[in-house]
């Protein structure tokens, strides 16, 4: 049942499971979608049709990181011959600020051993901040 949907790998140091979500019917997809929509503005999100198209590409991967069966975060990326492009990366709001983001990226880097491109959008804030 699990293995039909997931690629299961252990991160030894943190005892996390890395599970690949390969389609919208995956049992983890609703949790991914909840974190995704809460973490990214609408203009940076894929439509349902675009997500289905991405799943059809052999270069596209969406991996969920779980610890003790709790969905910690995800990385969606495109894997090319000499580099990897991380399109979306988010940690569930309940686990932010606890070092999971760095741990996931460190593991990701070790497993893929390629150049990693990661786009980062700056927060738009007024300076100086007003009350």
Question: Can you name each region flagged by the protein language model?
Answer:
Residues 64, 69-78, 82-90:
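Conserved beta-strand in the GNAT
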Residues 11-50:
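Short amphipathic alpha-helix that is part of the acyltransferase structural core
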Residues 95-107:
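Conserved acetyl-CoA pyrophosphate-binding loop and the N-cap/start of the following alpha-helix
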Residues 112-130:
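Conserved GNAT acetyl-CoA-binding A-motif
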Residues 39-67:
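Active-site rim helix/loop that mediates acceptor-substrate recognition in acyltransferases
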Residues 89-96, 122-124:
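A short, internal acetyl-CoA/4′-phosphopantetheine-binding micro-motif in the GNAT/acyltransferase core
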């Amino acid at each position: 049942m699990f293995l039909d949907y997931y690629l299961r790998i252990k991160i030894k140091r943190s005892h996390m499971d890395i599970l690949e979500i390969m389609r919208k019917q995956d049992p983890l997809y609703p949790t991914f979608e909840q974190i995704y929509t809460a973490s990214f503005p609408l203009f940076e999100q894929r439509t349902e049709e675009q997500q289905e198209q991405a799943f059809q590409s052999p270069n596209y991967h969406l991996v969920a990181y779980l610890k003790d069966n709790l969905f910690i975060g995800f990385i969606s990326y495109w894997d090319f011959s000499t580099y990897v492009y991380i399109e979306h990366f988010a940690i569930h709001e309940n686990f932010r600020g606890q070092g999971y983001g760095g741990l996931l990226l460190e593991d990701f880097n070790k497993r893929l051993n390629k150049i990693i491109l990661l786009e980062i959008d700056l927060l738009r804030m007024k300076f100086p901040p007003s009350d």
